[in-house]
């Protein structure tokens, strides 16, 4: 089975009361129960069932997970990111909610997980793409958030976006902003966690389009000259981790605003190895330099506040390497920042 509903036990935490003034994520999330579909590919229908099914037409944020680290294994990384979705839910669960999220005016719907079984990454990505497209196409969805998983998640996010009513199907200009220490533009015989944006570029070229791709946080020592040359050839816009630090929050805000200004739809992907190792030790490749959390958060809030953010994924959390759940907590804060900004749910 490559898709499954989230168990209710995934959303538990401190309970201070039942009113909106006490609201936390675990009290607000509504778990979508689904019948198993015959097909798990992009065309397989994701069926919702049960007496208390969350209304897909209600104003909401859709959440889903992709339990996969086969792409990391193929990329010779340290596996464990398949456990990322569960750890991210645990980190999100106790966070306080405010405004329309606390009052239930904007809901949180958990659509469940897709999974890579064994070494069949491609089937897992197809299942995740179908679930992602379903999240995007739910009538009331303001934002779809994918909890990874290795950065192979980005390819399934792309397929989901292309299979949804957003982007090219709607005649919309779309682009992807990657917060990452790496370009992930590798050319490999098989897809890995290091190839998703090369795959996107090839797919866009085949469709007669150019990939609009920007990256914040590139670590020069972690990307070869060949990767920089490939990025230049594809017209990628990027800042290194050192440039991000020098530019500060204002500069990063301008970078994101300028990128989003040319788009109708924005897809944001956060590889947690963009953060310094002290903040995010729980990743396959911890960053010696990294982009400080406040600057990364500025990029996230600017993207979320653009009015164009439709899809967010957060990837590369490896709980087995995480110290004191630092990485999971930082990731949860960034997800919460994005959701609060999109929904206008400040305190």
Regions found by a protein language model. Give the residues of each.
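Conserved alpha-helical scaffold segments that buttress catalytic/binding sites
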Residues: 2-65, 70-347
């Amino acid at each position: 089975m490559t898709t499954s509903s989230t168990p209710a036990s995934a959303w538990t935490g401190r309970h201070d009361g039942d009113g909106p003034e006490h609201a936390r994520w675990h009290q607000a999330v509504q778990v979508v129960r689904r019948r198993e579909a015959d097909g798990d590919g992009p065309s397989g229908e994701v069926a919702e069932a049960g007496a208390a099914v969350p209304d897909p037409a209600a104003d909401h944020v859709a959440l889903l997970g992709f339990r996969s680290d086969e792409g990391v294994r193929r990329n010779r990384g340290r596996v464990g990111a398949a456990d990322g979705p569960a750890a991210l839910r645990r980190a999100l669960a106790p966070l306080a909610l405010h405004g329309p999220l606390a009052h239930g005016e904007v809901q949180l719907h958990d659509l469940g997980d897709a999974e890579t079984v064994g070494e069949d990454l491609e089937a897992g990505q197809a299942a995740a793409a179908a679930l992602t497209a379903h999240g995007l196409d739910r009538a009331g969805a303001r934002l779809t958030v994918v909890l990874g998983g290795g950065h192979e998640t980005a390819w399934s996010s792309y397929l989901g976006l292309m299979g949804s009513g957003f982007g090219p199907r709607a005649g919309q200009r779309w682009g992807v902003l990657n917060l990452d220490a790496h370009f992930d533009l590798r050319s490999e015989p098989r897809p890995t966690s290091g190839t998703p944006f090369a795959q996107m570029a090839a797919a866009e070229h085949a469709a007669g389009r150019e990939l609009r791709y920007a990256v914040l946080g590139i670590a020069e020592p972690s990307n070869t000259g060949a990767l920089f040359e490939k990025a230049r050839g594809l017209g990628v816009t990027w800042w290194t981790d050192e440039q991000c630090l020098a530019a500060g929050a204002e500069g990063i805000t301008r970078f994101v605003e300028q990128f989003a200004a040319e788009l109708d739809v924005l897809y944001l992907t956060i590889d947690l190895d963009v953060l310094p190792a002290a903040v995010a030790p729980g990743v396959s490749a911890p960053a010696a330099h990294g982009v400080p959390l406040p600057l990364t958060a500025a990029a996230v809030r600017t993207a979320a506040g653009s009015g164009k953010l439709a899809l967010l994924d957060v990837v590369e959390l490896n709980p087995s390497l995480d110290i004191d759940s630092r990485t999971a907590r930082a990731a949860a804060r960034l997800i919460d920042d994005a959701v609060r900004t999109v929904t206008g749910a400040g305190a």
